[in-house]
A protein has these predicted regions:
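A charged, well-structured terminal subsegment
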Residues: 107-109, 162-188
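Short glycine-rich anion-binding loops that position phosphate/pyrophosphate groups of nucleotides
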Residues: 19-22, 75-77, 115-119
Length: 188
């Protein structure tokens, strides 16, 4: 993450991408909440899109564990009526969706949860920016075996080379995901 956007030079920020649909009590929400708690306990600041669903859940988990949160919201007209979730400490308003996506790629690591088209966009953009060295190669973890099927499409169709695939790790549990991020992406 750029030094000028950090609260302190020691702040380690993990961008968490995931769906906006999960609601409190659902499996997706509660898993994201656990992820937030574990990230905060590991000393990370949690950054996300700042709104509802897994963004709210991961922020809530981090705050419940005494951690810090950063929400990158959108000032564009389509988004203007949305309020950031109540678990966000710091809000940064991007002028449009592309600026928001770019800002979300400025992190010390990435964790991708279950989501929809927006999550897939964030995953692909981050992966491409790392692959082209537009952003530094940092830990990049996908949570859940369903992501392996997505990656397999790239392998089967020769869309991604082995070095490209080596940038991404798939974790089976929130604990494993946070451990991989803590280890700097080194693991299995």
């Amino acid at each position: 993450m750029r030094p000028e956007t950090k609260q302190s030079k020691n702040e380690r920020v993990i961008a968490v991408f995931g769906g906006s649909a999960p609601t409190e009590g659902s499996t997706g929400y509660e898993e994201a909440r656990l992820v937030g708690r574990l990230l905060a306990q590991a000393g990370f600041t949690v950054m996300n899109g700042g709104y509802m669903g897994t963004m709210e859940a991961v922020s809530r988990g981090a705050k419940e564990a005494g951690g810090h949160t950063l929400g990158i919201t959108n000032a564009a007209p389509f988004w203007r009526d949305l309020q950031p979730n109540p678990w966000i400490d710091r809000e940064e308003k991007a002028s449009d969706l592309l600026s928001r996506l770019r800002r979300l790629t400025l992190a010390d690591g990435f964790l991708v949860l279950k989501g929809s088209v927006g999550t897939l966009t964030e995953l692909a953009l981050t992966w491409s920016l790392m692959q082209t060295q537009a952003i530094p190669r940092v830990p990049f973890v996908l949570l859940g075996s369903h992501w392996q099927r997505v990656l397999d499409v790239f392998v089967t169709n020769s869309y991604a080379r082995p070095p490209d695939l080596a940038m991404i790790q798939v974790a089976d549990t929130p604990e494993e995901a946070v451990e991989l991020l803590t280890q700097g992406g080194k693991g299995r």
